[in-house]
Amino acid sequence: IEGIENLNTEKVTNMALMFASCSDLTSLDVTKFNTANVTTLMSMFSNCSSLKSLDVTNFDTRNVTNMFYMFNNCSGLTSLDVTKFNTAKVRNMYSMFMKCSGLKSLDVTNFDTGNVISMAYMFYGCSALTSLDLTNFNTAKVMDMCFMFKKCSGLTSLNLTKFNTAEVTDMSQMFNECSALTTIYASDEFVTTNVETGSNMFFNCIKLKGFIEYNKNTDKENYKYANYKTGYFTKLVGKNGDEKIGATGETLATDNLVLDDDKDFVAYEPFAAKAASYSRTMKEGTAWATLCLPFEVSLQNQNFRAFKLLSADDVTGTVELEEIEGSIAAGTPVIIKMKDGATKLDFTVANKEIAKDVQTAETANGNYQLQGLYTQKEFSKDTDNNCYIVKGSKLMNPAKLLDKTTTESVGSKPFRAYMADNSSAPAAGARMFSISVGGSTTAIEQLESTADSKAEYYDLQGRRLQNLQKGINIVKRGGKTMKVIIK
């Protein structure tokens, strides 16, 4: 269309059907359009199926209330930038992107949908989309979601955790023929209380699995199964690195939780795991380490002993540990001592509760504590001067290590613990922890306050011991003597 860039649209309020069914158009320049007064863009580009590109980034949509069918059947478009759209007043998004089958990506994260009442057919037939971020959608006023995602055959998952469907009356064929869809994340706000019709909602979602699997329940395809307790939805309960953790059932449970030192673990709420695992390989010669896992660990037939911290005194050089019997409670930070040169931790458990938060293990007087970690921690010389770690054979806190040496960073991997001095005047440099240095980040790996090849052990009668024993031990190491009590 020649000269369209010279069209003065300053006073136009209605652009409905403006280019509708211009199916032979391959290009269209609307970058100079003034849309400040436009209230409806209904079907503006509907059935412009030959358009290869369309630039609407300059559209001022602050007054638009209707985007019904706006880009319907623009099947030739592979990309469309609507990130600058102001949709605060829009009430109708019915079929807005329907049959945009060539779109490979679509960013609607900036859409304000607080006033939208219809999202029916909105993404129907967007078969080339492999992902769609709707986490900012406000659906509190939406009444119609029928056919919303029908034939979005490229989508493998949908995160609808922000969807509030209390006003929705029609969910018919909402996910119909989403044949690649494996997971739909939804919260307790996705309800069907007012739904009047919701037939074929999950029809032909052949890979979908929530509490039940579609392929084993093909007769269950209506809105009654739009939940995570008995149906096809999944509740988002946490993240494991970049991976979402989903759980289903009346008692929330995830199928398999595989924890890894390179992945931060965050739980949004307590849940259970049908299977959970964690492993760690330590350097040869490691005697002591720390551990904090979100599931219970049995101590039966393990290659380590586990201890809780009873007391610690930097001034007198006294530490007191008490051996844990039976099991380590979920989320509890502990000190462990490897047996017989073992360097591998390997846990595989079944049907365990997962603790949302790490526990704090304080000494009796509250002056010291073991703080567990589910996530990586980077220590600061300004705010972590009460935390105690060790570099090589020197026992230092992170503040000293960062301030007095060339070390640029000191950190801990997940599923470990560090000691903190909670007293009103923390003593710097408590000789409690040993760490190993690798790469650019120092990672807490061991608790070797007393046990290494250079240490000598004696009982109270002065008799030399081969290893630390239960009771009172006198330990000499590097010109320092300390009393260690192990219960």
Task: Report the location of each language-model feature.
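Short beta-strand elements of solenoid repeat domains
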Residues: L17-S21, M42-N47, F68-N73, Y94-K99, ...
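Structural signature of tandem-repeat unit edges
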Residues: I1-T13, S23-T39, S49-T65, S75-R91, ...
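Polybasic, low-complexity association/targeting segments
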Residues: G102, T182-T183, F233, G411, ...
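A short, polar beta-strand/turn micro-motif
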Residues: G238-Q302, E323-K394, T406-A443, I485-K487
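Extracellular/lumenal glycan-associated surfaces
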Residues: N176, S199-N204, G331-M338
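C-terminal outer-membrane/trafficking sorting elements
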Residues: S311, S440-K487
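Short, surface-exposed polybasic-aromatic patches that bind anionic ligands, especially phosphate groups
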Residues: L299-D313
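Extracellular/surface-exposed low-complexity segments
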Residues: F203-G249
